[in-house]
Amino acid sequence: MARPLIISDCDEVLLHMIVPFGEWLDETQPVSFKLIGNDFSTAIRDKQSGEPVEPAEIWRLLNLFFDNEMHRQSPIVGAVGAINTLAQHADVVILTNLHDKHNESRRAQLLAHGIDFPVFTNQGPKGPALQAILEKYQPSKAVIIDDLAQHHGSAKEHVPHIDRLHLCGEPTLAPHITCGFEAGHAHARIDTWEHALPWLLSRL
């Protein structure tokens, strides 16, 4: 008999990302990091000129971080216990927007924190990837957990029958991002695992 399926994002859902990324930049790179609101495009600035770096340089730095610095990421409060509790009631997979070359390192990173589930890497909107995962698992029910409203919008477009929880566990970022629930893409917006877990269990 098919089980329910939880499809969870990683960065800012299970593990902190923006804060350790910014700390690494400030410590080791000729740039500073200060996120004002949710405008990532102007958050990274040259330390000498104060000018924002070019988009290509942002991507280079992000890739460098994921190549070498993922050990800096730590779990969101309550995430490890909650996701493993959910695994007692459903299958769990991780759908993370990273280059495919980082799949194994993400898997190992999560495993080191006690999160032992299949990892699917993706680039761009998550709707098509969600569709493929659902075709593979054929779950009785499914729920996606993600911190970005646009991925809930893509999920609603491609797999509208699944439940969608907008969760951003990074308190410095959560107040500033577009709310997937308010936008009509997610069924709920809950930013702490303490309160998200009962909601998720009720959906299974």
Identify the role of each PLM range.
Residues 67-94, 100-107:
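Short, acidic loop-to-helix structural element flanking the phosphoryl-transfer center
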Residues 118-122, 185-195:
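Short acidic-hydrophobic, aromatic-tinged amphipathic segments that line or gate anion-handling sites
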Residues 7-9, 95, 145, 167:
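Short hydrophobic segments within beta-strands
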Residues 128-131, 173-181, 199-201:
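Short, charged, surface-exposed secondary-structure boundary motifs
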Residues 99-143, 149-157:
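Substrate-recognition "cap/lid" segment bordering the active-site pocket of phosphatases
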Residues 1-58:
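Active-site neighborhood of HAD-like aspartate-dependent phosphohydrolases
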Residues 45-80:
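Metal-dependent phosphoesterase signature
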Residues 144-188:
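Acidic, Mg2+-coordinating phosphoryl-transfer loop and its flanking beta/alpha structural elements
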